[in-house]
């Protein structure tokens, strides 16, 4: 089954769910439904706050995982890598030694998202510290860190369909 471009984010979901999202997108009610379910954006606005937020989640759920050297918002992420967040191991030469550093980059798209959506993408990237592949163990770890992970992932994918179809910024800060 080939999906319309805005619905490509829902490719692995059952047809009845995709049809519901498509209908809501067509009648213009999808944005309002998401805004009703997730009324407010999060308060994490800069790289320092994002680093602290990710560090707190990591300390709570993954104490023994390797430390993160960098956590930043990335404006090019979705266009360049076709990803919403990435976790990278970067090799740096320090003196005569090679040091591996771990970084997490979150797409700027999530700056104006609800806290639940930010938590979902951060949990996803943190899970990659322990599990490299998107397999059963990976998703079990995601669900251990965020029990509502699967619903949040679906809602994020639904939001991405809306953004791609309309360009709507549901939680953009209001200007005075």
Predicted feature residues:
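Active-site-proximal or metal-binding-adjacent scaffold patches in catalytic folds
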Residues: 1-119, 129-176
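Walker B catalytic acidic pair
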Residues: 125
């Amino acid at each position: 089954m080939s999906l319309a471009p805005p619905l490509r984010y829902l490719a692995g979901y059952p047809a009845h769910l995709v049809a519901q999202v498509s209908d809501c997108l067509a009648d213009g009610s999808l944005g309002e439904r998401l805004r009703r379910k997730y009324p407010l954006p999060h308060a994490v606005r800069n790289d320092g706050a994002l680093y602290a937020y990710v560090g707190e989640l990591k300390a709570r759920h993954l104490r023994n995982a390797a430390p993160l050297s960098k956590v930043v918002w990335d404006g090019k992420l979705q266009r360049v890598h076709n990803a919403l967040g990435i976790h990278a191991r970067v090799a740096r030469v320090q003196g005569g030694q090679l040091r591996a550093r771990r970084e997490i980059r979150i797409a700027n798209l999530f700056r104006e998202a609800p806290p639940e959506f930010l938590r979902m993408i951060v949990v996803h990237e943190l899970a990659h510290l322990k599990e490299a592949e998107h397999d059963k163990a990976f998703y079990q770890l995601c669900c251990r860190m965020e029990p509502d992970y699967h619903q949040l992932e679906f809602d994020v994918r639904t939001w991405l369909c809306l953004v791609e179809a309309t360009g709507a910024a549901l939680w953009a800060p209001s200007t005075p």
